[in-house]
Amino acid sequence: MSGLPVFVSAGEALTDMLRDGADNWTSQVGGSTWNVARVMARLGVPSAFAGAVSDDVFGDALLRASAEAGLDSRFLQRLGHSPLLAIVYERNPPRYFFVGDDSADLYFDPDRLPAGWHGAASWVHFGGISLARPPLRDTLLALAVRLKEQGVAISYDPNYRALMDERYDPVLRQMTALADVIKVSDEDLCGLFRCQDPEPALAALRAINPGALYLYTLGAAGARLLHGGHTWSAPAPEVRVADTVGAGDASIAALLYSLMRQPEAGMAQHLRYAVAGGAAACLAPGAAPPTLEQLQLLLPAVSVYNHQAVQS
């Protein structure tokens, strides 16, 4: 693999330990930023996940899954620290905690990435729990600032988790101010702003960076795309849902795919891709990255509305 990727997602790759019954556990590779990179690669975009994983069986599984997805392996660092684990002890509703006090992800070093990578990358994505876990948090914030200064487009999905308490507030403000595209869900907003009504929280978030493009996802109700004083909305198409794991990651990835591959398209079309991507991810169990064919088959089923007109 000689060429450098045009899309990079930086953050955490982890192992979900899922409780099945009283005494049985299964493992599954995951991590929101890793999954966004995997979806982009599945859609045909030369992509990489930039992060660090343990040098053990857990890291081996993530390395294999990354290779199978077509991610550039030069961006995945292997370190002699423990793995980052998400212990999911109840599924519905999900209850979990993270194990990784001194795990490999925390020691990711951007200086070890391939020379010239930031010159080739047109978009770099940040988010997930990586931005809530020092010292990785500070490493990624500094990287995002440097990339922004160099003219690289930044996308950001906070992907709220319980460890994002008031200590995360400065990170939320800084990353929102830096980002060109921000994806957030109604549940994210209620968690991040510690509130019951997501609409005032969305307005508060947008006030930090009024010029950014916001993808606001609403689960089964679809999504909105907001830019300046304009809003587009789209209900989710009807699909046979296997589960919703990874739908948010697929949604932001599909939006970024559309912005990268058809920048001249209107916002209605970009939103179609985002909503179709999220729906396509629901067709298979687990965080299964959708194919471009699956996504494009769903595009005609996505109707986009703006404040004045309806577009079929």
Locate predicted features.
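Conserved phosphate/ATP/ADP-binding segment of small-molecule kinases
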Residues: 150, 163-231
